[in-house]
Protein backbone atom coordinates (compact mmCIF):
# COMPACT_ATOMS: atom_id res chain seq x y z
CA UNK A 1 0.00 0.00 0.00
CA UNK A 2 1.82 3.18 -1.17
CA UNK A 3 -0.16 5.34 1.26
CA UNK A 4 2.43 4.82 4.01
CA UNK A 5 5.07 6.53 1.87
CA UNK A 6 3.07 8.92 -0.28
CA UNK A 7 0.55 10.26 2.23
CA UNK A 8 2.92 12.14 4.52
CA UNK A 9 3.65 15.85 5.16
CA UNK A 10 7.11 15.65 3.57
CA UNK A 11 6.32 13.63 0.44
CA UNK A 12 6.90 15.60 -2.77
CA UNK A 13 4.15 15.50 -5.37
CA UNK A 14 3.11 17.29 -8.54
CA UNK A 15 0.30 19.83 -8.83
CA UNK A 16 -1.46 20.15 -12.17
CA UNK A 17 -3.65 23.27 -12.29
CA UNK A 18 -2.38 25.52 -9.49
CA UNK A 19 -4.62 28.52 -8.78
CA UNK A 20 -2.81 29.57 -5.62
CA UNK A 21 -3.00 33.25 -4.75
CA UNK A 22 -5.78 34.20 -7.17
CA UNK A 23 -8.59 36.57 -6.21
CA UNK A 24 -11.75 37.82 -7.92
CA UNK A 25 -11.45 35.27 -10.75
CA UNK A 26 -13.98 33.11 -12.62
CA UNK A 27 -12.48 30.24 -14.64
CA UNK A 28 -14.77 28.69 -17.26
CA UNK A 29 -13.53 25.22 -18.23
CA UNK A 30 -16.61 23.72 -19.85
CA UNK A 31 -15.53 20.97 -22.25
CA UNK A 32 -12.07 20.68 -20.66
CA UNK A 33 -10.97 17.19 -19.54
CA UNK A 34 -7.93 17.11 -17.28
CA UNK A 35 -6.51 13.63 -18.03
CA UNK A 36 -4.10 12.54 -15.31
CA UNK A 37 -1.45 9.84 -15.70
CA UNK A 38 -0.22 8.70 -12.31
CA UNK A 39 -0.42 10.09 -8.77
CA UNK A 40 -0.72 13.85 -8.41
CA UNK A 41 -2.93 16.67 -7.15
CA UNK A 42 -4.79 17.80 -10.29
CA UNK A 43 -6.21 21.11 -8.97
CA UNK A 44 -5.10 23.32 -6.09
CA UNK A 45 -6.99 26.36 -4.80
CA UNK A 46 -4.88 27.83 -1.99
CA UNK A 47 -4.73 31.32 -0.51
CA UNK A 48 -7.50 32.38 -2.86
CA UNK A 49 -10.51 34.66 -2.45
CA UNK A 50 -13.64 35.02 -4.58
CA UNK A 51 -12.73 32.28 -7.07
CA UNK A 52 -15.19 30.17 -9.08
CA UNK A 53 -14.18 27.16 -11.18
CA UNK A 54 -16.77 25.98 -13.69
CA UNK A 55 -17.15 22.92 -15.91
CA UNK A 56 -13.82 21.13 -15.45
CA UNK A 57 -13.64 17.31 -15.61
CA UNK A 58 -10.85 15.35 -13.89
CA UNK A 59 -10.20 11.80 -15.06
CA UNK A 60 -7.31 9.35 -15.48
CA UNK A 61 -5.59 7.76 -18.46
CA UNK A 62 -4.92 4.59 -16.47
CA UNK A 63 -7.58 4.35 -13.78
CA UNK A 64 -6.26 4.28 -10.19
CA UNK A 65 -8.03 0.98 -9.55
CA UNK A 66 -8.06 -2.46 -11.12
CA UNK A 67 -11.01 -3.94 -12.97
CA UNK A 68 -11.71 -7.51 -13.96
CA UNK A 69 -14.52 -9.94 -14.67
CA UNK A 70 -15.63 -13.27 -13.26
CA UNK A 71 -14.74 -16.02 -15.76
CA UNK A 72 -15.54 -19.03 -13.54
CA UNK A 73 -18.06 -19.23 -10.72
CA UNK A 74 -18.67 -22.65 -9.15
CA UNK A 75 -21.12 -22.96 -6.23
CA UNK A 76 -19.95 -24.62 -3.03
CA UNK A 77 -22.18 -26.55 -0.65
CA UNK A 78 -22.57 -23.48 1.56
CA UNK A 79 -25.28 -21.03 0.46
CA UNK A 80 -24.03 -18.12 -1.69
CA UNK A 81 -20.39 -19.28 -1.48
CA UNK A 82 -18.49 -19.74 -4.75
CA UNK A 83 -15.09 -20.74 -6.10
CA UNK A 84 -14.30 -17.86 -8.42
CA UNK A 85 -11.72 -17.01 -11.07
CA UNK A 86 -11.26 -13.35 -12.01
CA UNK A 87 -9.48 -12.14 -15.14
CA UNK A 88 -8.18 -8.57 -14.84
CA UNK A 89 -8.13 -6.08 -17.70
CA UNK A 90 -4.98 -5.85 -19.83
CA UNK A 91 -4.00 -2.48 -18.30
CA UNK A 92 -4.49 -3.76 -14.72
CA UNK A 93 -1.59 -6.14 -14.02
CA UNK A 94 -0.92 -7.22 -10.44
CA UNK A 95 1.96 -8.86 -8.57
CA UNK A 96 1.98 -11.18 -5.57
CA UNK A 97 2.55 -8.11 -3.36
CA UNK A 98 -0.24 -5.97 -4.84
CA UNK A 99 -2.82 -5.05 -2.16
CA UNK A 100 -6.06 -6.51 -3.52
CA UNK A 101 -8.46 -6.52 -0.60
CA UNK A 102 -8.23 -2.99 0.81
CA UNK A 103 -11.61 -2.06 -0.64
CA UNK A 104 -13.33 -3.89 -3.47
CA UNK A 105 -16.69 -4.25 -5.14
CA UNK A 106 -18.59 -6.86 -7.16
CA UNK A 107 -20.89 -5.32 -9.77
CA UNK A 108 -23.79 -6.95 -11.59
CA UNK A 109 -23.00 -7.65 -15.24
CA UNK A 110 -26.30 -6.17 -16.46
CA UNK A 111 -27.25 -3.36 -14.09
CA UNK A 112 -23.79 -2.33 -12.89
CA UNK A 113 -25.08 -2.11 -9.32
CA UNK A 114 -22.83 -3.43 -6.57
CA UNK A 115 -23.55 -6.82 -5.06
CA UNK A 116 -23.28 -7.61 -1.38
CA UNK A 117 -20.30 -9.92 -1.13
CA UNK A 118 -16.90 -10.52 0.41
CA UNK A 119 -13.75 -12.52 -0.31
CA UNK A 120 -13.11 -15.31 2.19
CA UNK A 121 -9.72 -16.28 0.75
CA UNK A 122 -7.64 -15.12 -2.20
CA UNK A 123 -4.89 -16.74 -4.31
CA UNK A 124 -2.62 -14.98 -6.82
CA UNK A 125 -2.32 -16.89 -10.12
CA UNK A 126 -0.53 -14.52 -12.49
CA UNK A 127 -0.47 -10.81 -13.30
CA UNK A 128 -3.97 -10.91 -14.78
CA UNK A 129 -5.69 -13.70 -12.82
CA UNK A 130 -6.56 -14.65 -9.28
CA UNK A 131 -8.84 -17.20 -7.68
CA UNK A 132 -10.94 -16.67 -4.59
CA UNK A 133 -13.55 -18.15 -2.33
CA UNK A 134 -16.33 -15.57 -2.32
CA UNK A 135 -19.52 -15.21 -0.33
CA UNK A 136 -21.84 -13.10 -2.45
CA UNK A 137 -25.55 -13.20 -3.17
CA UNK A 138 -26.18 -13.97 -6.84
CA UNK A 139 -22.58 -13.82 -8.07
CA UNK A 140 -22.22 -15.18 -11.61
CA UNK A 141 -19.94 -15.34 -14.64
CA UNK A 142 -19.59 -11.95 -16.29
CA UNK A 143 -19.93 -9.93 -13.09
CA UNK A 144 -17.38 -7.16 -12.68
CA UNK A 145 -14.74 -6.92 -9.97
CA UNK A 146 -13.12 -3.62 -8.96
CA UNK A 147 -10.49 -2.98 -6.31
CA UNK A 148 -8.25 -0.13 -5.18
CA UNK A 149 -4.60 -0.55 -4.18
CA UNK A 150 -4.31 2.47 -1.87
CA UNK A 151 -6.62 4.62 0.22
CA UNK A 152 -5.40 8.19 0.74
CA UNK A 153 -3.23 10.19 -1.62
CA UNK A 154 -3.65 13.77 -2.82
CA UNK A 155 -7.24 14.91 -3.58
CA UNK A 156 -8.46 15.71 -7.06
CA UNK A 157 -9.29 19.27 -5.95
CA UNK A 158 -7.62 20.76 -2.88
CA UNK A 159 -9.06 23.92 -1.33
CA UNK A 160 -6.94 25.43 1.45
CA UNK A 161 -6.61 28.72 3.34
CA UNK A 162 -9.17 30.29 0.99
CA UNK A 163 -12.41 32.30 1.17
CA UNK A 164 -15.54 32.44 -1.00
CA UNK A 165 -14.75 29.52 -3.30
CA UNK A 166 -17.32 27.99 -5.67
CA UNK A 167 -17.11 24.86 -7.82
CA UNK A 168 -19.88 24.76 -10.43
CA UNK A 169 -20.59 21.88 -12.84
CA UNK A 170 -17.27 20.21 -11.99
CA UNK A 171 -16.92 16.45 -12.57
CA UNK A 172 -14.45 14.06 -10.96
CA UNK A 173 -14.38 10.64 -12.62
CA UNK A 174 -11.52 9.12 -10.65
CA UNK A 175 -8.80 9.90 -8.11
CA UNK A 176 -6.45 7.72 -6.01
CA UNK A 177 -7.64 9.46 -2.87
CA UNK A 178 -10.52 11.82 -2.18
CA UNK A 179 -12.42 14.01 -4.62
CA UNK A 180 -12.69 17.51 -3.14
CA UNK A 181 -10.89 18.24 0.12
CA UNK A 182 -11.26 21.60 1.85
CA UNK A 183 -9.19 22.69 4.82
CA UNK A 184 -9.04 25.91 6.85
CA UNK A 185 -11.24 27.75 4.37
CA UNK A 186 -14.32 29.99 4.66
CA UNK A 187 -17.54 29.92 2.63
CA UNK A 188 -17.19 27.09 0.12
CA UNK A 189 -20.00 26.17 -2.28
CA UNK A 190 -20.27 23.10 -4.51
CA UNK A 191 -22.98 23.42 -7.16
CA UNK A 192 -23.79 20.43 -9.34
CA UNK A 193 -20.55 18.66 -8.49
CA UNK A 194 -20.52 15.18 -10.02
CA UNK A 195 -18.21 12.57 -8.51
CA UNK A 196 -19.08 9.67 -10.78
CA UNK A 197 -17.12 7.09 -12.80
CA UNK A 198 -16.22 7.62 -16.42
CA UNK A 199 -18.64 5.89 -18.78
CA UNK A 200 -18.07 2.13 -18.73
CA UNK A 201 -16.53 2.04 -15.24
CA UNK A 202 -17.89 1.45 -11.76
CA UNK A 203 -15.48 3.24 -9.44
CA UNK A 204 -14.86 6.96 -8.92
CA UNK A 205 -12.71 8.12 -5.98
CA UNK A 206 -10.78 5.64 -3.85
CA UNK A 207 -12.15 7.18 -0.65
CA UNK A 208 -14.45 10.13 0.21
CA UNK A 209 -16.12 12.04 -2.59
CA UNK A 210 -15.72 15.23 -0.51
CA UNK A 211 -14.14 15.95 2.86
CA UNK A 212 -13.89 19.22 4.80
CA UNK A 213 -11.87 20.01 7.91
CA UNK A 214 -11.47 23.07 10.13
CA UNK A 215 -13.75 25.18 7.95
CA UNK A 216 -15.63 28.38 8.84
CA UNK A 217 -18.61 30.29 7.48
CA UNK A 218 -21.01 28.31 5.30
CA UNK A 219 -20.32 25.07 3.47
CA UNK A 220 -23.00 24.32 0.86
CA UNK A 221 -23.45 21.27 -1.39
CA UNK A 222 -26.31 21.78 -3.81
CA UNK A 223 -27.68 19.38 -6.45
CA UNK A 224 -24.54 17.23 -6.42
CA UNK A 225 -24.32 13.60 -7.59
CA UNK A 226 -22.04 10.99 -6.02
CA UNK A 227 -21.65 7.41 -7.27
CA UNK A 228 -19.29 4.48 -6.71
CA UNK A 229 -16.94 6.37 -4.35
CA UNK A 230 -14.98 4.41 -1.80
CA UNK A 231 -16.23 6.16 1.36
CA UNK A 232 -18.57 8.94 2.56
CA UNK A 233 -19.96 11.43 0.06
CA UNK A 234 -19.09 14.13 2.58
CA UNK A 235 -17.42 14.25 5.97
CA UNK A 236 -17.20 17.57 7.83
CA UNK A 237 -15.29 17.93 11.09
CA UNK A 238 -12.51 19.56 13.05
CA UNK A 239 -9.65 17.84 14.85
CA UNK A 240 -9.10 16.94 18.48
CA UNK A 241 -5.72 17.97 19.86
CA UNK A 242 -3.83 16.69 22.89
CA UNK A 243 -1.70 18.79 25.23
CA UNK A 244 1.78 17.29 24.90
CA UNK A 245 3.90 19.76 26.90
CA UNK A 246 3.00 22.46 29.43
CA UNK A 247 4.93 25.75 29.50
CA UNK A 248 2.70 27.41 32.10
CA UNK A 249 -0.91 27.30 33.31
CA UNK A 250 -2.00 29.13 30.15
CA UNK A 251 0.69 28.18 27.62
CA UNK A 252 1.26 24.74 26.14
CA UNK A 253 2.10 22.71 23.05
CA UNK A 254 -0.75 20.76 21.48
CA UNK A 255 -0.78 18.12 18.76
CA UNK A 256 -3.25 16.31 16.51
CA UNK A 257 -2.62 12.59 16.94
CA UNK A 258 -4.77 10.66 14.44
CA UNK A 259 -2.90 7.67 12.92
CA UNK A 260 -2.73 9.08 9.37
CA UNK A 261 -2.42 12.78 10.25
CA UNK A 262 -4.75 15.37 8.77
CA UNK A 263 -6.55 14.78 5.49
CA UNK A 264 -4.36 17.24 3.56
CA UNK A 265 -1.21 16.40 5.54
CA UNK A 266 -1.11 20.05 6.61
CA UNK A 267 -0.76 21.09 10.24
CA UNK A 268 -4.02 21.89 12.02
CA UNK A 269 -3.89 24.84 14.41
CA UNK A 270 -6.22 27.53 15.82
CA UNK A 271 -6.12 31.23 15.03
CA UNK A 272 -5.90 34.01 17.60
CA UNK A 273 -9.43 34.65 18.87
CA UNK A 274 -10.68 31.11 18.24
CA UNK A 275 -12.55 29.22 20.95
CA UNK A 276 -11.15 25.91 22.20
CA UNK A 277 -13.35 23.39 23.99
CA UNK A 278 -11.74 21.16 26.58
CA UNK A 279 -13.41 17.74 26.45
CA UNK A 280 -13.03 14.60 28.53
CA UNK A 281 -12.40 11.57 26.34
CA UNK A 282 -14.27 9.08 28.51
CA UNK A 283 -17.69 10.71 28.19
CA UNK A 284 -17.16 13.65 25.75
CA UNK A 285 -18.23 16.09 28.45
CA UNK A 286 -17.10 19.68 27.76
CA UNK A 287 -15.27 20.88 30.87
CA UNK A 288 -14.30 24.42 29.88
CA UNK A 289 -13.80 26.81 26.96
CA UNK A 290 -10.81 29.02 26.23
CA UNK A 291 -9.98 31.93 23.94
CA UNK A 292 -6.74 31.67 22.00
CA UNK A 293 -4.52 34.68 22.71
CA UNK A 294 -1.37 33.58 20.92
CA UNK A 295 -0.44 30.73 18.59
CA UNK A 296 2.75 29.59 16.88
CA UNK A 297 2.31 26.86 14.23
CA UNK A 298 5.24 24.42 14.15
CA UNK A 299 4.70 22.26 11.04
CA UNK A 300 8.13 20.61 11.17
CA UNK A 301 7.39 19.35 14.68
CA UNK A 302 3.73 18.64 13.82
CA UNK A 303 2.42 20.68 16.74
CA UNK A 304 1.60 24.25 17.72
CA UNK A 305 2.34 26.45 20.72
CA UNK A 306 -0.77 28.07 22.16
CA UNK A 307 -1.55 30.64 24.84
CA UNK A 308 -5.12 30.81 26.19
CA UNK A 309 -6.99 33.37 28.26
CA UNK A 310 -7.19 31.51 31.59
CA UNK A 311 -5.48 28.56 33.29
CA UNK A 312 -5.88 24.99 32.14
CA UNK A 313 -6.44 22.17 34.67
CA UNK A 314 -3.38 20.99 36.52
CA UNK A 315 -3.62 17.63 34.74
CA UNK A 316 -4.77 17.23 31.13
CA UNK A 317 -4.52 13.43 31.13
CA UNK A 318 -7.55 12.01 29.33
CA UNK A 319 -8.55 15.43 28.00
CA UNK A 320 -8.54 16.88 24.50
CA UNK A 321 -9.05 20.26 22.84
CA UNK A 322 -11.20 21.11 19.83
CA UNK A 323 -11.36 24.39 17.90
CA UNK A 324 -15.11 24.98 17.76
CA UNK A 325 -14.69 28.25 15.85
CA UNK A 326 -13.67 26.12 12.88
CA UNK A 327 -16.97 24.30 12.48
CA UNK A 328 -19.01 25.63 9.53
CA UNK A 329 -22.75 25.77 9.09
CA UNK A 330 -23.42 23.01 6.55
CA UNK A 331 -26.16 22.95 3.91
CA UNK A 332 -26.70 19.81 1.82
CA UNK A 333 -29.59 20.34 -0.55
CA UNK A 334 -30.90 18.15 -3.37
CA UNK A 335 -27.92 15.79 -3.58
CA UNK A 336 -27.89 12.08 -4.39
CA UNK A 337 -25.51 9.24 -3.57
CA UNK A 338 -25.55 5.59 -4.58
CA UNK A 339 -23.45 2.42 -4.91
CA UNK A 340 -20.78 3.60 -2.51
CA UNK A 341 -19.01 2.48 0.66
CA UNK A 342 -19.37 3.81 4.22
CA UNK A 343 -21.85 6.58 5.03
CA UNK A 344 -23.60 9.14 2.89
CA UNK A 345 -23.22 12.18 5.15
CA UNK A 346 -21.05 12.41 8.27
CA UNK A 347 -21.35 15.76 10.06
CA UNK A 348 -19.52 16.73 13.25
CA UNK A 349 -20.56 20.38 13.37
CA UNK A 350 -22.89 22.49 15.52
CA UNK A 351 -25.33 23.47 12.76
CA UNK A 352 -26.64 21.98 9.53
CA UNK A 353 -29.53 21.92 7.07
CA UNK A 354 -29.90 18.62 5.19
CA UNK A 355 -32.96 18.32 2.96
CA UNK A 356 -34.29 16.81 -0.28
CA UNK A 357 -31.40 14.37 -0.69
CA UNK A 358 -31.55 10.81 -2.05
CA UNK A 359 -29.32 8.03 -0.73
Residue ranges and their predicted role:
Residues 2-26, 35-54, 62-80, 151-162, ...:
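Extracellular beta-strand-rich solenoid/capping regions of secreted or surface-exposed proteins
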Residues 24-33, 49-60, 163-173, 186-199, ...:
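Right-handed parallel beta-helix
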Residues 35-46, 166-169, 182, 211-215, ...:
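Extracellular beta-rich repeat passengers
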Residues 36, 60-62, 67-73, 85-125, ...:
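Ser/Thr/Gly-rich low-complexity blocks that favor extended beta-strand/coil architectures
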Residues 50-52, 65-80, 243-275:
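Surface beta-strand/loop "capping" patches
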Residues 114-119, 123-153, 288-289, 294-331, ...:
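Small/polar beta-strand repeat architecture
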Residues 137-147, 169, 182, 197-200:
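Extended, non-transmembrane interaction/recognition domains
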Residues 185-219, 247-262, 358-359:
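Long amphipathic alpha-helical scaffold regions
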Amino acid sequence: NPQKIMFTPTYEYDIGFDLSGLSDVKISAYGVRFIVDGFMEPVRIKNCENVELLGLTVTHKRKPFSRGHVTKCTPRNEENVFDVTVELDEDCPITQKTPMLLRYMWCDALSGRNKNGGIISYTYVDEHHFTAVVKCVGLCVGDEFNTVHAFHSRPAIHIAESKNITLTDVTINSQPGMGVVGNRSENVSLKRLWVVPECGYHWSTNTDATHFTSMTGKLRLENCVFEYHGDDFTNVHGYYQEVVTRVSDTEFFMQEKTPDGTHTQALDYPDVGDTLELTRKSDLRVLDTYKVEKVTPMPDEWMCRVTVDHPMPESTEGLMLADVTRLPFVEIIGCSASSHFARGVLLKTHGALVERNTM
